[in-house]
Amino acid sequence: MEPAPLILLAAGGTGGHLFPAEALGVVLMQRGLRVRLVTDSRALRYSGLFSREMTDVVPSETVRGRSPVALARTGAMLGAGTLKALTLMWRLKPAAVIGFGGYPTLPPLIAARLMKIPTLVHDSNAVMGRANRFLSAHVTAIATSLPGVLDRDPALAAKTTTTGTPMRPAILAAAAVPYAAPEPDGPLRLLVTGGSQGARIMADVVPHAIEQLSPELWRRLVLVQQVRDEDMARVRAVYDRLKLNFELEPFFSDLPARLASSHLVVSRSGAGTVAELAAIGRPSILVPLPGALDQDQFANAGVLAKADAAIRIAQHDFTPARLAQEITALAADPERLTAMAAGARGVGRLDAAERLADLVVEVAGIPAKTMMYQ
């Protein structure tokens, strides 16, 4: 009996790339297909669907400058990665290779193209990332989380399907928890997160914003905040002095459940975060990461802001006074919080993993009879 077709999932080594790949992998395995992950060494830190036995690490390099030395280093690493990926394709013979963005996806997708293996890229951002943009003209098909991402290019738009962002089972479970607005005198559960690049600004601004809230709000507040180890002491000192009910951690392994139990979220606006806020349906205050060439986080936050589901604050406007003002206004208006939660849910797509799996099967040309639905 021949083994089931293999789908190779290629993703950069951060959660924003890995989590959608994991969510798709779960659905493909439920359909009786085999999956493997191709990524860079950063992904080995994540626990999840992909064990080390299911993961192949391919050399790659992010473009970090335009100097001749930087470009030569990047080119050499991508060349070495592509050679290794070609060997991998020859050995594994995947039915299709699916990319989820990040420079580590370039070698496997280029190798698949050279070997005439069907390819697809998925992009979760409102503005397509640079690696996916480079690959988009060469792949068999494109999937996006949001509509209209490639409307300015008719050739790319013609092979693009809007699927949404695949969600892990933990997110789908959290999405089943309905939003319950805070009672006027009851607890106000505030979740503050920002990822490795965003937690520093949250540590700089949020404690001083909390200081400016009323004593009544201090008594109501149940605060959960992601804080880097190096910022922990100074943040804790402020909250201890205010006698708050708070919890600080550098990383929350149960973040989906934390999102589900929150009344309001303060966060960066990476594609994964925005998609999870939409799927679970929670109001948010979003602070896009500045300086990105494509301003992708600004555009991502704009999707929820346009749906009246989030308040978007540029980092130069993200001051303690501004944040305190927004928290105070929302805490006094549970009806607005409820409307924001509903607006977020209106953006979310809970069936995205199934929709993307359908597209993968189509691109790979896998007959329905070869699959076994579990």
Swiss-Prot record:
One Gene Ontology biological process: lipid glycosylation
Q: Name one Pfam family in it.
A: Glyco_tran_28_C
GO molecular function terms listed in the Swiss-Prot or TrEMBL record: UDP-N-acetyl-D-glucosamine:N-acetylmuramoyl-L-alanyl-D-glutamyl-meso-2,6-diaminopimelyl-D-alanyl-D-alanine-diphosphoundecaprenol 4-beta-N-acetylglucosaminlytransferase activity; undecaprenyldiphospho-muramoylpentapeptide beta-N-acetylglucosaminyltransferase activity
Cellular component per GO, a single term = plasma membrane
Q: Which residues bind UDP-N-acetyl-alpha-D-glucosamine?
A: 14-16, 125, 168, 196, 297
Print the keywords alphabetically.
Cell cycle, Cell division, Cell inner membrane, Cell membrane, Cell shape, Cell wall biogenesis/degradation, Glycosyltransferase, Membrane, Peptidoglycan synthesis, Transferase
**Under which name does UniProt file this protein?**
UDP-N-acetylglucosamine--N-acetylmuramyl-(pentapeptide) pyrophosphoryl-undecaprenol N-acetylglucosamine transferase
The record lists the organism as: Rhodopseudomonas palustris (strain BisA53)
User: Source gene?
Assistant: murG
